[in-house]
Amino acid sequence: MANVVENLGKLERRVTISLPKDTVQKEIDARIQKLAKTVRMPGFRPGKVPLKMVAQQYAGQVEAEVLSDKIGQEFFTVSRAENLRVAGQPSFEPKQEQAEDAYAFDATFEVYPEVKIGDLATAEVERSTTSIGDAEIDRTLDILRKQRVHYHARGEAGEHGDGGADTAAKNGDRVTVDFVGKIEDVAFQGGTAEDFPFVLGEGRMLPEFETAALGLKVGEQRTFDLKFPDDYHGKDVAGKTAQFTVTMKKIEWPHLPEIDAEFAKSLGIEDGDLTKMRAEIKENLEREAKRRTQSIVKNQVMDALLKISELDVPKALIEQDQQRLVEMARQDLAQRGVPNAKDAPIPAEMFAEQAERRVKLGLVLAELVKANGLEAKPEQIRAEVDEFAKSYEDPKEVVRWYYSNQQRLAEMEAFVVESNVVDFVLGKAKVTDKEVSFEALASASAQA
């Protein structure tokens, strides 16, 4: 007899699952007999417990397990017979009216939606482009020099000079201070320190504190008021005004390494050739620019696809993805060293909007890939792995690392599929190219 599938909504369905009681009972009896061979009870050797006693002890548990298994199997059979594309897990409830010879359950579930993707020619995408020139290379060299900065005591002669005649603390100097802070003449936790180092101008300290330290010479001190921000991480002092006295103990001026052969060697240029160094920096910047532009345009393409697509999103899939995002958040907390991160009370509701977008986008992409043959080809995956490996010291080892793990390879395959989708959409959409600076590109990709 054909199963009747009821429509309860746009995606929600219900079907009745019927299980003959004699079939269920046979399975229960078989499992109890199997269980009796290993079950232990006081006063009996293993495998010698009377079958009746085993049944009395475990019948309820075994019946529940058998019904669960049989219902799942029957639902799978029915869903295949009725060509149902079930989204998520069904829920089963016993029917109020039961036949004498069968168990009857209502299975309620959702099905995958029909996905309608509009005309790609109407999609609008802005594609960022950037060029790497001497200015970008020089800025990168400046960053690299600052990463290798070392300090010398101001006023003391050394191989790099004495830092100038002015021995007062300036922005960029590393200073070492003692300080004492009080609120209404009472010291507070964290308000006192000795030999405390920081670099002026880095923003590590509150602005009033840095301003007070600027211009001081070794041995000088200054007293000043400092109002803690209302959102300051130290709740006991947030919003309050403290009086600090800071004493300058040491002032060191920054010396940046010269851009010479030794500097080039420190960047991995074995012969110290500056032209090679700049060429390699340019190549790395171009690779980074390509990665960032691809990321930005991918997000634009995904947004454009969502705008022109129509579909209902199964709640079951959204709920599953919410839980997945909760677990990802807990893993992130654990990696940051947060205690008991795996049990952190993170409400799934906070990911509702993000999960709905992810699920909706996944359904749209799946439809687009299937309809247009955009699956990842093995040679495409290998090309992306090779490209990724180029930025490492031993590319061959990185390639082996990828191909030794199916999960890592699957992640790269998903990346290739997304790239295929992006290229396909860009070939049909209204695309506007926009030249942006590398700095603007970096800022945009950080916000994406």
Curated annotation (Swiss-Prot):
<dbReference type="InterPro" id="IPR008881">
    <property type="entry name" value="Trigger_fac_ribosome-bd_bac"/>
</dbReference>
<feature type="domain" description="PPIase FKBP-type">
    <location>
        <begin position="172"/>
        <end position="257"/>
    </location>
</feature>
<protein>
    <recommendedName>
        <fullName>Trigger factor</fullName>
        <ecNumber>5.2.1.8</ecNumber>
    </recommendedName>
</protein>
<dbReference type="GO" id="GO:0043335">
    <property type="term" value="P:protein unfolding"/>
</dbReference>
<dbReference type="InterPro" id="IPR005215">
    <property type="entry name" value="Trig_fac"/>
</dbReference>
<dbReference type="GO" id="GO:0051083">
    <property type="term" value="P:'de novo' cotranslational protein folding"/>
</dbReference>
<dbReference type="GO" id="GO:0015031">
    <property type="term" value="P:protein transport"/>
</dbReference>
<dbReference type="InterPro" id="IPR001179">
    <property type="entry name" value="PPIase_FKBP_dom"/>
</dbReference>
<comment type="similarity">
    <text>Belongs to the FKBP-type PPIase family. Tig subfamily.</text>
</comment>
<dbReference type="Pfam" id="PF00254">
    <property type="entry name" value="FKBP_C"/>
</dbReference>
<comment type="function">
    <text>Involved in protein export. Acts as a chaperone by maintaining the newly synthesized protein in an open conformation. Functions as a peptidyl-prolyl cis-trans isomerase.</text>
</comment>
<keyword id="KW-0963">Cytoplasm</keyword>
<dbReference type="InterPro" id="IPR046357">
    <property type="entry name" value="PPIase_dom_sf"/>
</dbReference>
<keyword id="KW-0143">Chaperone</keyword>
<dbReference type="InterPro" id="IPR027304">
    <property type="entry name" value="Trigger_fact/SurA_dom_sf"/>
</dbReference>
<dbReference type="GO" id="GO:0061077">
    <property type="term" value="P:chaperone-mediated protein folding"/>
</dbReference>
<dbReference type="GO" id="GO:0044183">
    <property type="term" value="F:protein folding chaperone"/>
</dbReference>
<keyword id="KW-0132">Cell division</keyword>
<dbReference type="InterPro" id="IPR008880">
    <property type="entry name" value="Trigger_fac_C"/>
</dbReference>
<dbReference type="Pfam" id="PF05698">
    <property type="entry name" value="Trigger_C"/>
</dbReference>
<keyword id="KW-0131">Cell cycle</keyword>
<dbReference type="InterPro" id="IPR036611">
    <property type="entry name" value="Trigger_fac_ribosome-bd_sf"/>
</dbReference>
<dbReference type="GO" id="GO:0003755">
    <property type="term" value="F:peptidyl-prolyl cis-trans isomerase activity"/>
</dbReference>
<keyword id="KW-0697">Rotamase</keyword>
<keyword id="KW-0413">Isomerase</keyword>
<dbReference type="GO" id="GO:0051301">
    <property type="term" value="P:cell division"/>
</dbReference>
<dbReference type="GO" id="GO:0005737">
    <property type="term" value="C:cytoplasm"/>
</dbReference>
<dbReference type="Pfam" id="PF05697">
    <property type="entry name" value="Trigger_N"/>
</dbReference>
<dbReference type="InterPro" id="IPR037041">
    <property type="entry name" value="Trigger_fac_C_sf"/>
</dbReference>
<dbReference type="GO" id="GO:0043022">
    <property type="term" value="F:ribosome binding"/>
</dbReference>
